[in-house]
Amino acid sequence: METDATYRGTVYPWQCDHVGHMNIMWYVGKFDEANWNLFARLGLTPSSLRESGRGMAAVQQNIAYKRELLAGDIVEIRSRLLEVRDKSVRFLHEMRNAETGEIAATCEFVGVHLDRKARKSAPFAPAIRNAAIKHLDPAEPELAQAT
């Protein structure tokens, strides 16, 4: 997978809680923004999803908090695909303090491709699935053809 960041941003004072660090609701929001940048790299752009009547839904999300982020910290998220199936992808985001390089949090997601009209899961188009397979993390090669 490309090593370009899927999210870059800043921790603002209003995003911090009474303990003085970024509140968990903002971690979730920043990871969500990274999701959409990752999906766009695979060809799942907002316009293609609208035009095709498709969508993506998170069905599992596991966050591990490693280090706190404070107001003014610059945040960067890098993402990698771990598994590609006919109707779903599993991927990992690493949120880092861009200044120190320390991992602040990780988030593993399972995202399912949806037919919005039928309101149920749908297979990825072959071009999307092939693009996803090409972006698989090299450490996870046995999962490239999972179904």
Predicted regions and their residues:
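Terminal targeting signals and extreme-terminal segments of soluble enzymes
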Residues: 1-76, 82-147
